[in-house]
Amino acid sequence: MLQEHNKGTRQYELPFGIGLAISAQDGLRAVKQCSSELDYLRRKEYGLTRNVVYRKRCVRGVYSEDADSRDSVTEVDSPLLGSRADILDLDNECKSISSPNSPVKAQSCEPITLQVSKPFPTADLSNVMFGVATTLSRLQDSIPQFSHWLSGTGALFLAIVVDDSVTDDDLDALESMYEAHNISLTTIRPWNCSFDVNEQHFAILHDLIDYSTHETQWIAIIDDDTFFPSPYSISQLLASHNASEPTYIGGLSESQGAVAFFGHMAYGGAGVFMSMPLVEQLDSHVEDCLAQSITRQGDGLLNDCIRNYTQTELIAIPGLHQLDMRGDLSGFYESGTFPLSLHHWKSWHQAPVDKMAKIANYCGDCFLQRWKFGGDSILANGYSISVYQDGITQAELDLMEGTWEEAMGYEATMGKMREKAGEGKKKSYRLIDAEEVDGSLRQIFVLHGASDMDLDGEQEAMDEVVELWWDWPRGD
């Protein structure tokens, strides 16, 4: 398989798992493997340049009841990135070009200790049934994200698969894939195939009633790109409300324009939660609501039906995020907020949410928590490392950075903002991967495209990589 590796260089996977080769002026030549601690840098999906600037920092997480509140930014005197950086040749055993006589010792790095909260308890969502309407392929593609928050929770998951050509074997295979991830998925076809996928998000109410059990207290309707960083936080949210009364919980859009146009309602991408008494009230009115409502959006149909046939009012939860913003959402993710839900992460903006939130498995409330190092660097845990050329003050950090399109128009819903950092004022390393390695967590942050001169004096791109290696005291 051919892949781009660097300007003027193409990399090939050799057959039978024997390694890699790259094209060169004298033909193909083999790529020498890196050490086991560094070989991950050559993964095809990372798309790194042949030569990279590499830094590693070891972080020791110490569980503490006194861990600083997320409302403030914890300050650390020492720099985050440290003084050591190596330029590695990924096509030549990941050898250091900058210090050829000093081999890179990937296992040793400058340590730093951070106080963090303990992991959240295991979530029990056995009283919740989640429902979605989407295509077979999107359900297949979304297994890593659904696994993060559904696996092992005991929740029921019902999916209307809207493809005309889907077969029983397709549905059985999909259920087996989810079962392998400890998710109880039931797939069904629409009871009315004339409805589009948006209408199916409301019509699914009938099915959710039919497939609920005596344990089911809550019904949740979501989009296929709704993501909950912490299932425990969702269980706590629901536990704080009365499931024996008609209850309607959700999040408004952050866009004033969307709320003005679509209305004051629970927006579906943020997650809509209803108690069983409310769903039972609506069940007999589904066909009438489909016939009467002007809107054809599932969340709008649901809201109109609730307003027309019940006395239940919306309980709006700020942490449930529709994220109706386009472009660069780094300002949101770097603001220190702990989101209950995220949306549009693979369409209106791009964020590897399942990899980002992996840190929450180790220190719960520390996901997207901020630490300030040496006056100029901010770690937004799980998302980015930002280095500010002129430093950054607490007053500036108290304001969300308006990085996305027309961001200043969101101040009414998201609070006062600061302007986006000017060109060259902020250097951002974004997380591209996170994985457990022998009980530790490795986070990989990348800054693409920094320039340098190659051996022939030509300017070439060179990516920068920061590896954070998290360890926790065993047995804590």
Predicted regions and their residues:
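Active-site-proximal specificity loops/subdomain of glycosyltransferases
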Residues: 161-218, 232
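A conserved hydrophobic helix/loop-capping motif in glycosyltransferases and polysaccharide synthases
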Residues: 127-137
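C-terminal catalytic/acceptor-binding lobe
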Residues: 1-112, 121-124, 307-476
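Conserved catalytic core of nucleotide-sugar-dependent glycosyltransferases
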Residues: 226-309, 313-324, 332-337
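Short coil/turn segments at secondary-structure boundaries
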Residues: 142-147, 162, 170-176, 201-202, ...
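Phosphate/oxyanion-binding active-site loops and adjacent basic polyanion-contact surfaces
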Residues: 138-142, 193-202, 227-230, 267
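Short, acidic, metal-binding catalytic loop of nucleotide-sugar glycosyltransferases
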Residues: 122-125, 144-157
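Short beta-strand-to-loop acidic/aromatic patch adjacent to the donor-nucleotide binding site
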Residues: 215-225, 306
